Structure formats: C-alpha cells, structure tokens
C-alpha cells in the first residue's frame, strides 16, 4: 500500500482523491483551523493545524509520497497575482522569483545569501523544498519516492522553476 503525507491539505479535496486512489494518508497539515475541522470530519483524525514554516523533518512520518496543494492566492486570477516572492532571512530583502531567467539559486539579489523564506503564500512551495533538504541531510530514509503537487493554471509560467527545484532535489517532474 502506498502511504502519503498531505501538506497544505485544506478541507481535504486532494486527500479524498488520494484515499479513493488507494493511498493511506499518514499525516496532514493546514494552517486554517476551519479547513482542519472540515478535513477531520470528512477524511480523518490524522490532520493537524500547523504552520508548514514551523514543521521540521522530525515532525513528518516516512511515507511513499508527499502531496501538496500549496497556496495559490498570489497566483490565481481571483487573487492579488503577486507572484512567488521570497524574503532573505539574512538581510530582509524581498524579491520575486524570476521564472523567465531562473537558474538554481534563489540567492538574494541584495546580499547573495541563500537563506530565505516565503514572502507570499504561493512561495510556500519552497517550504516543501526546505523539508526535502532537511530529510536529505538528517533523515534520508524519510525522502518520499513521489511528490504530488497541484495548483492553479496561473502557476504555468513558474513550472520551469518548480521543475528545476525538483531536479535539484533528485526528482523528475511531469507537467
């Protein structure tokens, strides 16, 4: 049986589909307490209200797959369309990920630092990449075999960025 951890699980749309496809969900997380309550009632008690930025690999059970529908508000036509932005934790500079000229290295354009966090909700994708990096460094047995991501159509221009990040982490991507 395939197992999965469900990040940014919301009310459980992706989780329900994964369950129906035969996956066993080990753990799910979302920031919104109402979404977590709905998930718990419809999918199961394996859900936890948490900020993904505060999770560490020690909090994540070993699973075959990680699924994540990271926030889309900054990409969606119904949202602010602010794009994916990062904030340097060394100097505080905020910058938009340049999907047209992306090469690995979200180095801060101001100080060159590579320590950053999401500055927009859609930048939370990079928190998954942080967790994968933590797994590789601290608990390689927790690296999932499969990554499943879903998002809105407006993510399209950023797909090469995601593909580059997946490749850097040792995964092939299909979109």
Where does each model-flagged region fall?
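Conserved active-site and SAM-binding loop architecture
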Residues: 1-175
């Amino acid at each position: 049986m395939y197992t999965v951890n469900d990040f940014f699980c919301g009310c459980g749309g992706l989780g329900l589909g994964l369950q129906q496809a035969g996956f066993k969900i080990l753990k799910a997380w979302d920031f919104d307490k109402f979404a977590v309550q709905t998930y718990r009632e419809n999918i199961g008690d394996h859900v936890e209200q948490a900020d993904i930025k505060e999770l560490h690999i020690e909090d994540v059970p070993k699973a075959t797959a990680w699924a994540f529908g990271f926030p889309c508000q900054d990409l969606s036509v119904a949202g602010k369309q602010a794009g994916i932005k990062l904030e340097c934790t060394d100097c505080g500079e905020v910058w938009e990920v340049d999907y047209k000229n992306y090469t690995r290295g979200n180095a801060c354009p101001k100080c060159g630092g590579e320590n950053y966090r999401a500055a927009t909700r859609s930048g939370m994708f990079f928190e998954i990449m942080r967790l994968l990096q933590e797994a590789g460094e601290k608990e390689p047995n927790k690296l999932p075999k499969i990554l499943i991501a879903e998002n809105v159509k407006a993510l399209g221009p950023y797909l090469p960025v995601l593909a580059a990040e997946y490749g850097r982490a040792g995964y092939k991507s299909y979109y």
